[in-house]
Amino acid sequence: MDQAPFDQQVTFLYTRDLATTVRFYEQVLGLSLVLDQGTCRIYRVSADGFLGFCQRAEAPERPAGIIVTLVTEDVDGWFARLRERGVAFEKAPALNPDYNIYHCFLRDPNGNLLEIQSFRDAAWPRKR
C-alpha cells in the first residue's frame, strides 16, 4: 500500500450513564481524559489509540459482538490491580493456545466486554 497508515484511532461506544462510565475509566482503569465534549469523553488508551464514550438514552444495555482489547505485556499486573479496585472478572488470566495470546476478560459498567491481552506471537508489532 502506498498510503501511510492513519495517524490515530478512536473507538466510540455509547453509554446511558456517562458519570458512571467516567468514574470507571478514570478512577478504576486510570485512563487520562484527553477531550471533554460535554456528552462525549475521549480517553487515551495508548500513544495513538483512544476510547470515547457518548451519552445516549438509546444505548444498548449489554452490547454484543464487540470486544475492546487493551494490549499490555503485564496482564497479571493489571488483573491484580483491578481486582484490588473491586473489579469482577469474567475470566482470569490464561493462555489461549489457539491464538497464542495470554488474556483475561471483564465488563465495564455499560456491559462492554473488555479484554486485557498480551500477544505471545513474535510477529506482533511491539511498542515503538
PLM regions and their residue ranges:
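Amphipathic alpha-helical segments
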Residues: 17-32
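Vicinal oxygen chelate
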Residues: 17-18, 68-113
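N-terminal beta-strand motif that seeds the catalytic metal site of vicinal oxygen chelate
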Residues: 1-19, 66-68, 120-128
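Positions that flank functional sites
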Residues: 40-41, 97-98, 126
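A generic hydrophobic-segment detector
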Residues: 105-128
